[in-house]
Regions:
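Class I SAM-dependent methyltransferase SAM/SAH-binding core
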Residues: 1-20
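A conserved beta-strand element that flanks and buttresses the S-adenosyl-L-methionine
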Residues: 29-30
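Short, solvent-exposed loop/turn segments at secondary-structure junctions
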Residues: 35-37, 62-64, 106-108, 133
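A short, conserved alpha-helix within the catalytic core of class I
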Residues: 36-51
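Conserved beta-strand signature within the Rossmann-like core of class I S-adenosyl-L-methionine
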Residues: 52-72
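Short alpha-helix
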Residues: 79-106
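Core SAM-dependent methyltransferase catalytic element
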Residues: 105-133
């Protein structure tokens, strides 16, 4: 029998159903390589703003250095992905009261975009923090 309890030295709840988010407050919200599968991610954030943590982390996320675009993905998933622009993501989070405090890039082949988009794409980690009033 496998235990579901792991002592990390702090409380950890993992919630994967959006309806369960309504009654919770979070320190950290993690989007791990997911936003490219939701073409309306940025426009839908306003309705989810109250449910984002004080910190928002994007990991292994392909972002456009120019305008957003749609590309085929070449990995285990072979469908379409919407590559949101770094500028749009930054602007939306600024409007929501967040500040970008960390960014890093990963090897570009991880973005798995069509060849014509490779030079326009960065595969990134971003960390935003909620500004205090």
């Amino acid at each position: 029998l496998q235990s579901n309890f792991v002592d990390l030295g702090f409380r950890l709840n993992i919630i994967s159903q959006e309806e369960n988010l309504l009654s919770e407050q979070f320190d950290l919200t993690i989007f791990g390589s997911t936003i490219q599968y939701d073409k309306n991610f940025l426009t839908g954030l306003n309705s989810r703003n109250l449910h984002l943590g004080d910190y928002v982390l994007f990991t292994h996320t392909p972002l456009s250095l120019e305008k957003p675009f749609v590309s085929k993905q070449f990995s285990d998933y072979t469908g379409l992905q919407t590559i949101h622009s770094f500028e749009d993501v930054s602007k939306v989070f600024e409007k929501l009261g967040y500040n970008l405090i960390f960014k890093s890039t990963l090897p570009p082949e991880g973005a798995s975009v069509e060849d014509e988009y490779t030079n326009k794409t960065v595969y990134a980690n971003l960390l935003f923090t909620k500004l205090k009033n």
